[in-house]
Amino acid sequence: MEKPFDILLIEDDIDDVDLLKDALLDNNVSYQMEVIMEGDKVFNYLSSAEILPEIIVMDLNLPKTDGKEILQEIRSSSSLLEIPIVVLTTSSSPEDIDYCTKMGISKFITKPATIDGWNSTIDSIVNVASSSRN
């Protein structure tokens, strides 16, 4: 049996959290997920986590601390630098895409509105997480 993926999901919309969890299950992805819904709680979690996540999936539009600020802090930490990051957000602005690319994210995905879109999103997340294991 394959080891479950350790995922950190930084997302403030409970409906999107549930959709992502359902899509992971529908695609038979074995995972353990920590969900953080407020940006200001991310570094408390990461600094006290016994096991770092294999992949971070995050929104850019978060309460209390902006997702871009979180992304910059993650990429500034040597212990977190190698963790792949998938940005999953409603934003599709060229500025956001450019910023995230410069921060070294693995994938930028605009939140889908269809089941097929969510299945494609799951495929992307699993591919990024799998490649980090190799």
Stretches found by the model and what they are:
Residues 63, 81, 93:
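The feature encodes the CheY-like receiver
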Residues 37, 62-65, 74:
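Hydrophobic residue at a beta-alpha junction
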Residues 11:
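Conserved acidic carboxylate
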Residues 35-55, 119:
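Acidic, metal-coordinating helix/loop segments flanking the phosphotransfer/catalytic sites
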